[in-house]
Amino acid sequence: GRGAAVGAGIGAIIGGAAGAIIGNKMDKQAAELEQIEGAQVEKVNEGEAIKVTFESGILFATNSSTLNSASRASLDKFASSLQNNPDTDVEIYGHTDSTGSDAINNPLSVRRAESVYNYLISKGVSGLRMSYEGFGSTQPIADNSTAAGRTENRRVEVFILPNAKMIQDAKQQAQ
């Protein structure tokens, strides 16, 4: 389903008091992220992680992995939020619609995720806390037989997860 944790690496739910502390931090960051043009923000993993979806149409031209100028303003604000919240790990996933072959879509989805990754690095976000991956057309969220559905399926999803330090700090605070 739509709210399923896409990244297998999304991690176990911490739960309890420590999970509530992490959830509060994620609530604050989610509120910040909701101000960004073109970003759809939802909390996942019982509120302990954030999923931000950027429609590829906002970021890229068709069949392109070059960020357009309009998307840069959104990603600048996104990078700023990541820098203000350093105790998180960031997973960037590229997705395409089903138009074209896997031979085109799979590398395109990787290049799109990598473009976002490289742009965030250029804005000062540490590459050590980020990873990226492309899924081609294997994880549609809408019907590929309609133009609107294909538009929804062309997207970059970014998961913001508590890193080991945030989890450790929350567990100590919860004691």
Question: What is each model feature region?
Answer:
Residues 1-31:
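Short, low-complexity, glycine-enriched hydrophobic/amphipathic alpha-helices that associate
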Residues 12-16, 53-61:
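Acidic/histidine-rich, surface-exposed loop or edge segments in extracytoplasmic proteins
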Residues 12-13, 28, 32, 70-77, ...:
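Extracytoplasmic/secreted proteins, especially bacterial periplasmic and envelope-associated proteins
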Residues 18-20, 59-68, 102-105:
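Second-shell loop/turn segments in exported
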Residues 26-54, 58:
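Amphipathic, membrane-active segments
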Residues 38, 59-94, 121, 151, ...:
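Periplasmic peptidoglycan-binding/anchoring modules of Gram-negative envelope and division proteins
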Residues 50, 88-90, 130, 156:
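Conserved beta-strand core positions
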Residues 95-169:
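Periplasmic OmpA-like peptidoglycan-binding domain that tethers envelope proteins to the cell wall
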